[in-house]
Amino acid sequence: MPVMERVAEETVATNNIQLKARVDDVPCNKLDARHNDMVIQSETANSDCPGSSAHRNVDLTKPPPPEEAAGAKLSVEELTLGNYRIVQGSNNTNVDSPRAGKFEHLYRLARGSAFRAGDGDLDSQPRDMDQMLSRIRQQLAGAPSERQNLKPFMSRRSDQNLEAFSERLRAAGENSIMNAPALISEGVQMKTPVSSSNFSQLLLKRAMKGKGVVGKNQETPPEFVSDQDLGSKEKKLDISKSPTPHDVLPLKSSPKGNGMVSHGDGNHSKSSIGISLREFLRSSYAKREKRHGLCLFRQLVELVDSAHSKRLFLLDLRPSLFTLVPSKKLRYIGNFGKNDLESDVDEDLNRRRPVVEESSSGGRDSKKRKMDLHLNSPGNQLQATSTGRPFKRKSPVIDLNMVDARNPDSCELQQQDYIKNLSVSSVSRKQSMSTWLEEQWYTCPEEINGEDIGEKSNIYALGVLLFELLCHCESGEMHAAMMADLRHRILPPTFLSKYPKEAGFCLWLLHPEPSSRPSARDILKSELICEDDSVKSTAAAEEISELLLHFLSSLEVQKKKKASKLLQDIQTLEDDIKEAERRYSSNVSLVRSHGAIEKRVQSSPLDEHCTTSSALFVPTANTDRLMSNIRQLEDAYFFMRSQINLSSSAATARSDKTLKDRDRCSENQNENQDMSTKGKSSDQLEVFFEGLCKFARYSKFETCGTIRSGDLLNSASVVCSLSFDPDEEHIAAAGISKKIKIFDFNAFMNESVGVHYPLVEMVNKSKLSCVCWNSYIKNYLASTDYDGVVQIWDAGTGQGFSQYTEHQKRAWSVDFSPSDPTKFVSGSDDCSVKLWSINEKRSLGTIWSPANVCCVQFSSYSNHLLAFGSADYKVYCYDLRYVKTPWCTLAGHEKAVSYVKFMDSETIVSASTDNSLKLWNLNKTNSSGLSPGACSLTYKGHTNQKNFVGLSVLDGYIACGSETNEVYSYYKSLPMPMTSYKFGSVDPISGNEYFDDNGQFVSSVCWRKKSNMLVAANSTGNMKLLKLV
């Protein structure tokens, strides 16, 4: 006989006997009157069988129908821990309703009239029992055949259970008191008579006793956390209080129990943080690698071993209950049970005690019951509480109302429910069937035989999982067939040939005898897992070796390149040494031919004004300076050498004549231009030697004079701009004091004067930002201020005579044209550059910039070339004849460009608040787009991050201020500072100078061309005349 039929018969019989035993013990005559209106309402669990329905409420305060009153003293209903609730005030007494009719056989069982005559002989009507069992067999005959064939290893004793059970069932009527737990199946719901609330609570306490829901709550290990457990805490049931409906109802659906996590649905195909292992296996039937499969298997074994070490085991070890997160880690979201050997001993002892002892000692709570596990298949729903011993699983609970053929309404309801079940979507049926099949694949032989399950059941499931992780299937149908054969320990030939070692290991795990299977710890120590570790170690070692080989090879290539470069540099140095010796020898021979100066050359090889070739012999005093800057000198030298071939290429030069387009030049300017052209050598080696000579020639700034022009009553004394007149006899200083002060140059030499007063002082309405002297008209000056006003002043009268107010924001810079003294240009924060004429009130033209204009400068070597610096980190050059597009754009600074100066006709120097100066070669620019290759050199050493510190150039020398209250000097061919000078603070009372920055900075510098002297001013209004020595 199939297992499902026998279990169903046992379920029915157990219900009947248990009900009778409990009803006979109810003290019906002593019910409390105040509880007569109390009704216990319950609903049966859902069944997969068509026709199942919920029981109707029965009012027990009224007598039963006449046909039942003879033998019935109390009507009963089905009571479970999940559907227990009390409804008061119910007056429903329609016992003859269709729903009540479904309980008719239960009423008969309760009053002993179901299978006995008036004398109470249970065997007097065996025909009714046979008919009931026959109907159950017919109903179960339509169940899937697979369910009846799940026991390839089931023992023969299962066939004998039904006969023994039938004998106990027939003998039940002969004993008024019998051991109900001996007949109760673990999947059967408890039947209890309805009585007063005190009696109901007593029954609930007894029902919960041993179920693990009233004991101490065991925490779930972190390896086995359910998705439902994240961020939630379950309430513990207090056993010191009487159970109430609120205490009992949550027990059935609680996601966490003592030793077990319960899920409402067996379908765990997806998770919010990954996919289930089943989905992964299904999606990679034919493309899985052995290494990856063994890696996942090792994680599974480690999880199982961790649970076993805590005396727990996994109740649902199957792929659907594992989640594979993106990090390729497995997470168990199923249930687990507690494996306690002491509980097994206690339960075996309690099972041998007579029922009389149990009845007399109802207050004893030490007895532990087995776990109540309802398995609805397919699409099962696990609802369980903890237990103190290994678990058993049984077939689904059969609703006894289904077999009540005497009630026609019951049949009608069965048909309706059957139709509803048929209307379930195909997707749901497919998922349910898939889950049901998976359960059958992973059910161990001892569970099918009805034996206890425990740690060894996990080992069997691991064997099935190992096969699934390694096998290759072309389709789902082939996979299902392989899994069906696996239950009989039949492995595919391809699997045996491809994985012989793994196949033997898999069969070891699938051994029919649990005692012959290894433990999880043995699996971790097995050759299969250790071999995987060795493979990983070998792979890691190979990877490290490959990485090391790649590193060494790359380093070798890099060093060979450096060696080649070094050899090339050495060859270059040898050639330049030979060239320098040749030049020096020729110069020495030339000098010696003049007998008048031969003695001088021998005594002093380096004169103060030495030639380029004589720079080979450096005075001892400058040796330390050269060696301290050897790295920068080296970079400058090799940069110069790299530019030799590029400078001789005509393709890199601009083809237009804008750089040297002069149609109005004075005689002096023509001479200066010719001298500049003659002085500029095309020999890069000679240029470098010249720079080295000049670097070695000067070592410091010497103070030649000081002008203290700061106002004692005005703290705002910053000098923003300095400018010499055409004859360089007077210097104009302007700043935020709103005054333009003109000093006599000779006043710098008079150190005896404490405070110097200007020759002329002109007052402006706003703070001044720039002043510029006209190079042709001696008395004319131009200034810009913070209001955006451009004004022309007459230094002879000390008055301004013309104002230009088209700028809308602060004007930063103004410059007169060297070729046309009546024209000047200004730049402003309104992003415009305006060209003016002294003879016109309105601007002659406007050039719009993408950002604020910080400085403007005319070229001294061209009539039409104009350059300005912008706050967008770029320098723009324009041909004034074509102002729609820039003549070139120079990009390379990292902050706003504060100053622009023409070094010569082909070179521009720019200053920025990024702590650097840059030298630009205009011959390497282009008219379309940026000119990244135009930057020849970058000078660093000074500090300039937020203030305008001044910039001035003369004959290859560059001077600028610093926010460290210093003046720095560079030479055009070398990137490092040649020398520097630090301003000191002057005590206004004593007049003594002390060195304390206190936030001061050098704000303006200006070269005096006649004497190679520099005038510098700082933020306190002090001006110094400095000379390179």
Swiss-Prot record:
EC assignment: 2.7.-.-
Basic and acidic residues composition bias: residue spans: 230-239, 654-666
GO biological process: chloroplast organization; negative regulation of photomorphogenesis; photomorphogenesis; red or far-red light signaling pathway; red, far-red light phototransduction; regulation of photoperiodism, flowering; response to blue light; response to far red light
Induction profile: By PHYA under continuous far-red light. Circadian-regulation under constant light. Up-regulated by red, far-red and blue light, and during the night phase under short-day conditions.
Localization (cell): Nucleus speckle; Nucleus; Nucleus, PML body
Region (Disordered): 42-69, 213-269, 347-392, 653-679
Coiled coil: 557-589
InterPro entries: G-protein_beta_WD-40_rep, Kinase-like_dom_sf, Prot_kinase_dom, SPA1/2/3/4, WD40/YVTN_repeat-like_dom_sf, WD40_repeat_CS, WD40_repeat_dom_sf, WD40_rpt
Predominant cellular place of this UniProt entry's protein: nucleus
Keyword GTP-binding: no
Function: Controls normal photoperiodic flowering and regulates circadian rhythms. Required for suppression of photomorphogenesis in dark-grown seedlings and for normal elongation growth of adult plants. Integral component of the COP1/SPA E3 ubiquitin-protein ligase complex. Involved in HY5, HFR1, LAF1 and CO degradation.
Comment field on protein domains: The coiled-coil domain (557-589) and the WD-repeat domain are sufficient for SPA1 function. The coiled-coil domain is necessary and sufficient for interactions with HFR1 and COP1. The protein kinase domain may play a role in promoting destabilization of SPA1 under far-red light. The DWD box is required for interaction with DDB1A.
Protein name, UniProt field: Protein SUPPRESSOR OF PHYA-105 1
Record organism: Arabidopsis thaliana
